[in-house]
Amino acid sequence: MELPVPQKLPDPPRSFDEFLKSQNWDYWPRDVHFRDSDIWEDTLKKLEEAISYTSIYSYLWTNVPRLYDIVDSLESKLKESSHLLQHHASRLFESDKMISKKRSYTNLERYKAFVKEHYRPKKIALSDRMETEKNIEGCTFLFNQNEVTQLPRHLDAKQIYLYVLKTHNFEEKVFKVWKTHVLSDCSIALLHDSFWWWFLHKFKPDKRDEDFLFDRIAESYVTLFIKIPLRRKDAFFKMYPDCLTQAVYTTFQESFPESCSLFNDKFKEDLGNTIFLWLSGLKPETGFWTHWKLQDLCTTTIHGSRRVPVKLRRSVIPSQEHIPGIRDLKIEDILKNPRAYAMPKLMKESVASKAATKPSHYRSLGPEFHKVLFDFGGQSPLILYYLKMHELGGISVTHNPKGTKFTKILREPSPAPTYCDIIRDAKRKFADNKKDFKRVKQRIKDDIKFLREQQELIDKELDRIQAKASKNLQEVKNEFENFLHKQRVEAKLKEEYGGSTSASESPQSMQSPQSSSSFPTISEDFNNVEEG
């Protein structure tokens, strides 16, 4: 009896495109249509109730044992230790019982004299490798296959990471979780190798060492990616590229303070673009470094001490070498109080550097966007490089023509006045208009005051003439004719020299018609009285 020849089974699909081809599908997932929709709806409702927060919480509360005894004993021990600490602290600060004030000052002076007499400055012999300068030119890199190369000037990567994490102002619980992952061995190695790779790439190119470092960077990143729990991956790796970029930038500022002029905005932009592309495959937004809280690194170290300006340091050290009288001057004194030795120009520069500038957008419609096909096989070049380096198959980097798209900035808006500039100009114009309004208002008040004074003078003159009219009619008539003659002469002069009248003459011209109109009535009354 002949056995049937076994048929060769087809190979399983190794990529997303092969899977669609084997199923004769154009896209996936397919739309599922259920026959008994009511039964499926009941099943889905029961499933939602079973996996709800309340049901899971009640199940855990019922079945998971709770060890309250351990917590109670720990709390009691903490309270006991706290009481003991308070008791000992109170005894320590009872200075009247423990220290004699009269003897303390005499002993202090005696100890100071003893220390001053027998003081010898300590001399520490540094190896050639430990003696590093504070600039880019004096630093060299030596690759070690078995361990990471230490940072310049014996900087501690953990201290740098902690400094960067504290600038983010995380909550206490979030800070503790991120601190555990960021200070892990693979993350520390990632900072070391990324710093040295960027140092070689930017300042002292060496293709061989850069390739070795990049291999180790990929290893460290994949190890870190695997160690992060699944529920925290998205949140952590959304924050980590920016954190690593800030840590590398901080390391450059701490390692080479004399070369801080090289670490400008373009340096930060290139560094951030490189690290973001390594870890996520995407570039960050333009000007991402503006939200960093590292502006004081040029003048302050990560430990809070003030930096001595480079110009001041270069001027102090040669003077100590050539002038014998300044050899006793300690550089520590300058470090403690650099303002006492700095010039006013440096003080102005330090004050100007502290002035915070608020970012503002251009007055425009904003950047132009366009849709870009998302590459599912190249989200992280480091992970992809790691898989290729270890010759792991099943990696497809081809684009799916019907895949997911995401929005990308096509063109940034052209430079234009910002909204802050517009608001500042509007405030300035408003202030100028307010000043002009006050000036015009004051001038109108002065004109009204002048007109009232002229009106009062004319009224007084008329009252005086009317008072004299009852006493001596002939004298009043002569004075009145003189007054009219004077008014006619002034009016004639104004007509001849019109256009050159002063501000004081304008109110008189305004009042002259009124006065001339009233004078004929007075003359008529005077003639009637004379005839009578």
UniProtKB/Swiss-Prot annotation:
Which segments show compositional bias classed as Low complexity? 500-523
Coiled-coil regions in this chain?
Answer: 432-482
Region of interest: Disordered: 494-532
Q: Which cysteines are joined by disulfide bonds?
A: none
Keyword Cell membrane annotated: no
Which domain of life, per UniProt? Answer: Eukaryota
Enumerate the transmembrane spans.
none
Keyword tags: Coiled coil
One Pfam family name is FWWh
Q: Does the keyword Coiled coil apply?
A: yes
Similarity comment text for this entry = Belongs to the FAM227 family.
Q: Write down what this protein is called.
A: Protein FAM227B
User: Which species does this protein come from?
Assistant: Mus musculus (Mouse)
* Lineage, opening ranks: Eukaryota, Metazoa, Chordata, Craniata, Vertebrata
Gene name tied to this protein: Fam227b
